[in-house]
């Protein structure tokens, strides 16, 4: 029997605190990220039982889900939002938790803030009451979303019961073509696996197309691991990772960093380790992707026709396609470029980092947003916003007719004022195109930042490769 382990197994095994026979092991949790929506009841539970937070120094909070992107006024997103944000402030003050509130220079989307501050490090277990916690797996950490009762458990004990997951390797072989982004890679992956293909697995993304990505690109890929049904997504840390971490606020410095890198370098799947499932993609075949349906697996290349329901052999997929086409107001056989978009959203924990802003700005520069389109650019954090403004990206966007907003989750999830009206069609860089996700009866198409910016200018979806060629 081989002792070879996958990256997931190495991190999982290193964090088992208690393994009682017949029960799920208890894992130690290295980092706990907290936001205003899933934490109020957890703090109430601590208060009722007279408990303190076990490791307050490993707990970090911010406000992101329902903050306004137009003003720092806490009342702007409505009563429920105000209550949640005020409650988070009160709870963090009472329990001694570090909070980056509305007016803090580190405020931002929780999954943007953690990595950019060096809170997220390789080999860690990281949890947050948010399904896209998988983002942090880009660093080779085991990161996953938890429910509110689990939030309370981690606050109280710094541990969590976790069953061992199955392992899946997703190998994206070779190099992608010019203009193909991390978002296109992950949408192509989900198109192949389907939105449920990773259920029960922790996925490790491998292959040249993955290791070629920057840290920000890797975060985009891992962010959407949950969208193929996986518990978490991982990418083994390498020199790209170490270079990104160096010099950040909470990352190790000097000799500590050298020692950490020596350990982090061991965090890779052993050569003869076996995965429970393997999925392979040819990177050179990946084109710019656009979702057409109501789950992220319903996705096509921008130049492909909208699929007909009868083209699906599986009766469940066929029925799902029929329902999705009706909801989305699309006709099989037509091109997605035949349909006008009403709104464009560049932002979310998937695509709101500085490289995403630069990619959208490169398309926006010297061009104008179509007259019928409202286009929002929402940086993922105050740090991203400041960097973008330093580079003059905000000016490029504003001159082109885009709205340059304040940081927050924004139009990803309709928990604030940024949302779609009924039947409005949106080119969005977010991660979920479910029915009503961006507003009741709203129609969401998931794309990369460059594709979103191009759609804003043309007024409909266009193949980014044709624009890049003209520039």
Curated annotation (Swiss-Prot):
Keywords: 4Fe-4S, Amino-acid biosynthesis, Branched-chain amino acid biosynthesis, Iron, Iron-sulfur, Leucine biosynthesis, Lyase, Metal-binding. Its EC number is 4.2.1.33. It catalyses: (2R,3S)-3-isopropylmalate = (2S)-2-isopropylmalate. Pfam families: Aconitase. Pathway: Amino-acid biosynthesis; L-leucine biosynthesis; L-leucine from 3-methyl-2-oxobutanoate: step 2/4. Binds 1 [4Fe-4S] cluster per subunit. GO terms for molecular function: 3-isopropylmalate dehydratase activity; 4 iron, 4 sulfur cluster binding; metal ion binding. Its cofactor is [4Fe-4S] cluster. One of its GO terms (biological process) is L-leucine biosynthetic process. Signal peptide: none annotated. [4Fe-4S] cluster binds at residues 349, 409, 412. It is an enzyme of class 4 (lyase). InterPro entries: 3-IsopropMal_deHydase_lsu (IPR004430), Acnase/IPM_dHydase_lsu_aba_1/3 (IPR015931), Acoase/IPM_deHydtase_lsu_aba (IPR001030), Aconitase_4Fe-4S_BS (IPR018136), Aconitase_4Fe-4S_dom (IPR036008), IPM_dehydratase_rel_enz (IPR050067), IPMI_cat (IPR033941). The keyword Transport does not apply. SUPFAM superfamilies: Aconitase iron-sulfur domain. PANTHER family: 3-ISOPROPYLMALATE DEHYDRATASE, HOMOACONITASE, MITOCHONDRIAL-RELATED. HAMAP family: LeuC_type1. Catalyzes the isomerization between 2-isopropylmalate and 3-isopropylmalate, via the formation of 2-isopropylmaleate. Belongs to the aconitase/IPM isomerase family. LeuC type 1 subfamily. Heterodimer of LeuC and LeuD. This is 3-isopropylmalate dehydratase large subunit.
